[in-house]
Swiss-Prot record:
Its cofactor is Zn(2+). Keywords: Cytoplasm, Hydrolase, Metal-binding, Metalloprotease, Protease, Zinc. It comes from Dictyostelium discoideum. This is Insulin-degrading enzyme homolog. Binds 1 zinc ion per subunit. Belongs to the peptidase M16 family. Residues 1-21 are annotated as: Disordered. Zn(2+) binds at residues 74, 78, 155. GO terms for biological process: peptide catabolic process; proteolysis involved in protein catabolic process. Its main location: cytoplasm. It comes from the Eukaryota. Gene3D superfamilies: Metalloenzyme, LuxS/M16 peptidase-like. Its EC number is 3.4.24.-.
Length: 962
């Protein structure tokens, strides 16, 4: 008893020493605890949360892989989810999380590995018990090892044609002899060996030690209860007193390198990587002066005087981006990417010369002052994140801060301006300290001599010589390069407009005139000076080739014309704006400080309603859209099969090849006249939520209504997406080759049409999906190893309900995927019937489904996004409440009948459309296999219009009656 009291007293003393700095707008309760085994834990108590979360991060990642077993750290991350001594059933944890409304994941980065989950609050302790056992007694059974090898191999195969992974790999490979040059993901060629289980266990035993781990536990419980959980479940993790391996500095050891490589997608870019090995400049440790962040902001600026502005006005570049990355203290790098135009492609040396000219400046203090002001406002008006985002951020920050007290404020901790640090970083941005990747889809085709072994990247490599330096120096100094001016749009008025009494205010209609409707909700809960505005464009024509091409051109024209004067300045103030070209409609989303959001939107709509471009601008946006369309052919196969599914099942008939052909022919005058005509008959529905008054919302409605030559469109003429009415007792297969000749994966998207939307059917769909998703994943991915991408979920696009299964595989054919899917649905009846024998489990299923579909939002941004999703789905801002009630009324008999009527392969109501994509190395069968008494159809390419015309469409009206 005395010992326990002494232990409690000691813990109380330690807590007094560590008090986490907390935002005045954050009502969570926090506690830092260091367990006896050396494990550092942050506890977060949020008495309002519906979901709980835990994240464990370990300061060991892919950089610690043994050179002879590349990918081992990533493979271990996979293995820890597959059974422990306490919970030996392989998918015990995964199934528990899914059945209790949660999600989980693991990520392996170069310097750390993260494991995290969310779950319904009531199941939190049980989830912690299962989760913590990963780090105490994992099984890593031999058969699980062999199966998960296939999963890792499939994951790599899924990434092989993605240029992000390819660029990263070919650049890192140049740090010869350094751990950074290793193949981080791993595949069967690096991991398939007789002793792989022994090696993965050895890696775990060597590095997985409590003193290298950080944990964050987030729940509704009190801090004392959460601390009890921490001791109960994480104290048994062994402290082996392991040190993170001392790795060599990341540096250029000989000459700078030029890599010339072929991308997968249509792109021409230059990527510059500058390693910075100086430990005192470590980016993640210099968070109180943000020197790397300020330098990145200046170099990546897009307004007048910036490098991008010069390149843009010379028609050399479409875009420029910069990132600063820190792995360990002696491993930092700055990366700059420039996407080139056709003109820029012919002037690469001048582009490089201008890049190095742009590095020559002294940093004025106003860049720091602006960043500090924004940081202070964001800290003062702190907005909660989703539980999993919170736990991941906290564990990550624990590794970076000087003192645990600073963990929560890590990203908002600007204290001193350090121009000397910025100057030191600049000193590493030299032509003799870089790797340059020239990544071009046209320049090097058929002209490369080397092949990278893991991603099959075709490339050339040469050292950069003094003659290159001299050539770049020979370009005259460009007088248009200078430091951009101070930001003219800094927020001035951040006054909160409503009392923060935590009352809920559903958006209400406050303006309705001449085809313009505005809905408004003033925030009383989140104490944020920001607002969100969403605008739906209600169009008389949409979904065809012409409209899709024109809207893509318009989207590019926004940044083309407005970026330098206003949009970029706003973007650095946490202003986000997206013109979304969706299957259902077009919408503009905007989120920003309330005192500038309507000014920005006014400028945007003035541009849209008075659209004009010069010839150079139109040429450039047309080139951008052409690249985007061509790159769409190189998406992952599962994304392409989903696109084919949409093409054949909805009243939008925009085929990618047709869009490309139409784009080639369209002229500037046709583009301008199209929107002049379209905007003469258009309606708008807008939602204003957050720190904006009714007067602000109504004034914005008046702005939308004031445009000359605009008339309201008749509601019956406004485009509405509708779903094809698939025939009963019929399976329709659509087969097509993939465009990418190097793609080795196939994919199938299989849709079971349920019918028109109604509330009971939708609620039943949500209930059955809460079982289906994990069961389908376990069967086709875990057990049968069909591939990395396996998913089953509901889809209500076009106000019709369907169940959609997606699989991508490099080891199976689409026919095998389809057969396995149908076999799964035959066996799924037994899974359902279990709940008939266990009413208590069915009751739990219903309750968990309710919780999963009505999660409390943690911020103004998240809440407003949820409101908008309900409005665009069914026009009812309070649909969440109805959904909760409807799910609660679903019985087992409802679920079983739903299965028998719509999903059982034996039903006469079966309505399936299956879109299959084949690599060009495959043979597409000419016939389709019969399936019992079900009629089976086969469609080929270009038959979508006839198919839709023959079958007609379901009504797109939403029935909100019970």
């Amino acid at each position: 008893m005395v010992a326990n009291e002494q232990q409690q007293q000691q813990q109380e003393e330690e807590r007094k020493e560590v008090k986490l700095i907390q935002s005045p707008n954050d009502n969570n309760k926090y506690r830092y605890v260091k367990l006896k085994n050396g494990l550092e834990v942050v506890l977060v108590s949020d008495e309002t949360t519906d979901q709980s979360s835990c994240c464990l991060s370990i300061n060991i990642g892919s950089l610690c892989n043994p050179r002879e077993i590349e990918g081992l750290a990533h493979f271990l991350e996979h293995m820890l989810f597959l059974g422990t001594e306490k919970f030996p059933v392989e998918k015990e944890f995964v199934n528990f999380i899914y059945l209790n409304g949660g999600s989980y994941n693991g990520t392996t980065s170069p310097n750390k590995t993260n494991y995290y989950f969310t779950v319904n609050q009531e199941s939190f302790e049980e989830a912690l018990d299962r989760f913590s056992s990963f780090f105490i007694s994992p099984l890593m059974n031999e058969d699980a090892v062999n199966r998960e090898l296939n999963a890792v191999d499939s994951e790599h195969n899924n990434n092989m044609q993605k240029d992000f992974w390819r660029m990263d790999r070919i650049v890192n490979d140049q740090f010869e002899g350094h751990p950074m040059s290793m193949f981080f993901t791993g595949d069967s060629s690096t991991l398939k060996r007789d002793d792989i289980r022994e090696k993965v266990v050895e890696f775990y035993q060597r590095y997985y030690s409590a003193n290298l781990m950080k944990v964050c536990i987030f729940g509704r419980e009190s801090l004392d209860q959460l601390e009890e959980y921490a001791n109960k479940y994480f104290l048994p993790i062994v402290n082996k007193d392991v040190k993170v391996p001392k790795l060599p500095p990341l540096a250029i050891t000989s000459k700078s390198i030029m890599i010339e490589a072929e991308p997968t997608q249509d792109m021409d870019l230059l990527k510059f990587v500058f390693p910075i090995p100086d430990e005192k400049l470590c980016f993640s440790k210099n968070y109180k002066n943000a020197s790397a962040s300020i330098l990145s902001h200046i170099l990546g600026h897009e307004c007048q005087g910036s490098l991008f502005s010069v390149l843009f006005n010379k028609d050399y570049a479409f875009s420029l981006s910069i990132s600063s990355n820190s792995f360990y203290e002696n491993m930092n790098k700055i990366e700059i990417q420039i996407h080139l135009t056709k003109t820029g492609l012919e002037n690469v040396d001048e582009v490089i010369a201008l890049l190095f000219q742009s590095f020559e400046f002294d940093t004025p203090e106003y860049f720091f002052t602006e960043k500090k002001l924004l940081s202070e406002i964001n800290w003062k008006s702190f907005q909660k994140s989703a539980p999993a985002s919170t736990t991941q951020a906290i564990t990550s920050n624990l590794f970076r801060v000087e003192r645990p007290e600073e963990t929560l404020k890590y990203n908002n901790f600007l204290e001193q301006f350090a121009p000397e640090k910025i100057k030191e970083i600049q000193s590493y941005l030299r032509p003799d300290n870089m790797i340059c990747l020239f990544y071009s889809s046209t320049k090097f085709k058929g002209k490369t001599t080397e092949i990278e072994p893991h991603y099959k990247i075709k490339f050339n490599k040469r050292y950069i010589e003094q003659s290159d330096f001299d050539k770049w120096k020979s370009f005259p100094k460009n007088t248009n390069l200078f430091l951009p001016k101070e930001n003219p749009f800094l927020p001035i008025d951040t006054t909160i407009k409503a009392p923060q009494d935590h009352s809920i205010h559903i958006p209400k209609e406050v303006y309705n005139n001449n085809g313009v409707k505005v809905y408004h909700s003033l925030d009383h809960r989140f104490n944020s000076p920001k607002a969100r505005v969403n605008i739906r464009f209600e169009l008389t024509s949409y979904g065809n080739n012409q409209s899709m091409v024109m809207w893509n051109l318009l989207k590019k024209s926004l940044k083309e014309v407005l970026n330098e004067k206003i949009l970029y300045y706003l973007s650095v103030l946490d202003f986000s704006m997206k013109l979304q070209i969706l299957t259902t409609h077009v919408e503009l989303q905007c989120y920003c400080f309330n005192d500038i959001i309507f000014t920005a939107l006014g400028k945007v709509f003035d541009f849209l309603m008075n659209l004009d471009l010069n010839d150079m601008q139109f040429k450039r946006i047309k080139e951008k859209v052409a690249k985007r369309f061509l790159s769409s052919h190189y998406l992952s196969p599962y994304q392409i099969s989903m696109r084919h599914l949409s093409l054949h099942n909805f009243n939008c008939n925009s085929m990618l090849l047709d869009k490309q052909e139409y784009l080639k022919k369209v002229t500037k005058s046709e583009f301008l006249n199209y929107f002049k005509s379209l905007f003469s008959y258009i309606n708008f529905s807008a939602m204003v939520v957050g720190n904006a008054s009714i007067e602000d919302a109504c004034a914005f409605g008046e702005k939308l209504n004031s445009f000359s030559n605009r008339n309201s469109a008749c509601p019956g003429e406004v485009f509405k997406l509708a779903r094809v009415n698939l025939p009963s007792n019929t399976i329709t297969h659509q087969r097509e080759f993939l465009y990418d000749t190097n793609q080795t994966n196939c994919s199938s998207s299989i849709s079971f049409l349920i019918g028109q939307f109604n509330r009971k059917t939708y609620a039943t769909t949500l209930v059955i999906c809460s079982i289906l998703g994990s069961a389908y994943f376990e069967e086709l991915r875990t057990k049968k190893q069909f591939g990395y991408v396996v998913n089953c979920a509901q889809d209500c696009t076009g106000n019709a309900i369907s169940m959609r299964c997606i699989v991508q595989s490099h080891t199976k054919t689409p026919e095998e995927i389809f057969d396995a899917t149908m076999e799964f649905f035959v066996g799924f009846e037994k899974t359902l019937d279990y709940f008939k024998t266990s009413p208590s489990d069915f009751k739990d299923l219903i309750e968990n489904c309710q919780k999963q579909n009505t999660v409390k939002q943690q911020s103004n941004s998240a809440q407003s996004s949820l409101y908008w999703s309900f409005f665009t789905f069914c026009g009812d801002f309070e649909f969440e409440k109805k959904k909760y009630e409807d799910i609660g009324k679903i019985t087992f008999d409802d679920v079983k009948q739903y299965y028998l009527d719509h999903l059982s392969p034996n039903t006469a109501n079966l309505r399936i459309f299956a879109a299959h994509c084949y690599p060009q190395s495959y043979q597409i069968p000419d016939e389709v296999k019969p399936f019992g008494n079900v009629k089976v159809n086969l469609l080929r390419k270009y038959e979508h219009d006839n198919f839709k015309e023959n079958h007609g469409y379901l009504s797109s009206k939403v029935n909100l009656q019970k």
